[in-house]
A protein has these predicted regions:
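Membrane-helix interface residues
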Residues: 26-27, 50, 77, 139
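Helix-loop junctions at the membrane-solvent interface of multi-pass transporters
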Residues: 26, 46-50, 101, 161-162
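Membrane-interface alpha-helices at helix entry/exit sites of multi-pass transporters
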Residues: 83-88
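Membrane-embedded alpha-helical segments that form the functional core of polytopic membrane enzymes
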Residues: 33-82, 112-123, 165-175
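Intramembrane alpha-helical segments
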Residues: 18-23, 27, 63
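Ser/Thr-centric signal marking residues that sit
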Residues: 30-33, 179
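A feature for the membrane-embedded catalytic helix bundles of lipid/isoprenoid biosynthetic enzymes
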Residues: 1-19, 89-199
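Membrane-interface helix caps of multi-pass small-molecule transporters
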Residues: 21, 25, 71-75, 134
Length: 199
């Protein structure tokens, strides 16, 4: 077993207990998803106040809910198409709230440059999700690109715990631009190839 595998097993032990408890108490996975977004709003508020470490801790808690909701759905046989839709919509609210918290902070500090960087990072972060959703309405899969939501959340946590959030916004922004471009090009090629096959 690798070191990361061992760490994964250790971390999963308490999460399995939480998942089992939620299933036993018949807590609906959609409820867990909603609790997660409320906790992320609290993290956004902490960011707005400049309390980065507090925000980082709250984000860790919020993402426990984000992780277990799907597991609880499987364990309790409550998987549904609406559940997947609900999860995606709530994730967008969670993401945007974190960006808005930072924008509020930087605006209060009169750091117009950081406000612009964060706003652009937010815009392209939203576009990474939109381009994939729109592409997958036309082609089977569009999972290309590096900057998915899990990577964004990890970067947010790194920025919070290291007090380097402005640098993290640059990283998220740049990688999101490349991800959006990659998905546009990939979708174009897939559609072009499909049209050539039909022709």
């Amino acid at each position: 077993m690798t070191f990361t595998g061992l760490i994964g097993r250790i971390c999963m032990f308490p999460l399995r207990l939480i998942i089992a408890t939620c299933v036993r108490l018949r807590i609906h996975p959609n409820t867990l998803t909603f609790i997660g977004v409320l906790i992320n709003v609290a993290a956004a508020w902490a960011l707005a106040l400049g309390k980065f470490v507090t925000a980082g801790v709250i984000m860790v808690v919020a993402n426990i809910f984000d992780f277990i909701d799907g597991k609880v759905a499987h364990e309790s046989q409550a998987v549904s198409e609406f559940g997947g839709f609900w999860d995606s919509v709530i994730d967008r609210f969670s993401d945007i709230s974190l960006f808005i918290g930072l924008i509020f902070l930087y605006s209060d500090l009169r750091r117009t440059d950081y406000v612009m960087v964060t706003a652009l990072a937010m815009m392209f972060a939203i576009m990474t999700s939109y381009t994939r959703a729109r592409a997958e309405s036309l082609i089977r899969k569009c999972k290309v690109g590096f900057m998915e939501r899990p990577e964004r959340i990890v970067l947010f946590m790194i920025g919070a715990f290291t007090n380097r959030m402005a640098a993290v916004m640059w990283v998220i922004g740049v990688l999101s631009v490349f991800t959006v471009a990659d998905r546009i090009i990939y979708t174009y090629r897939e559609l072009r190839d499909a049209e050539q096959v039909v022709a």
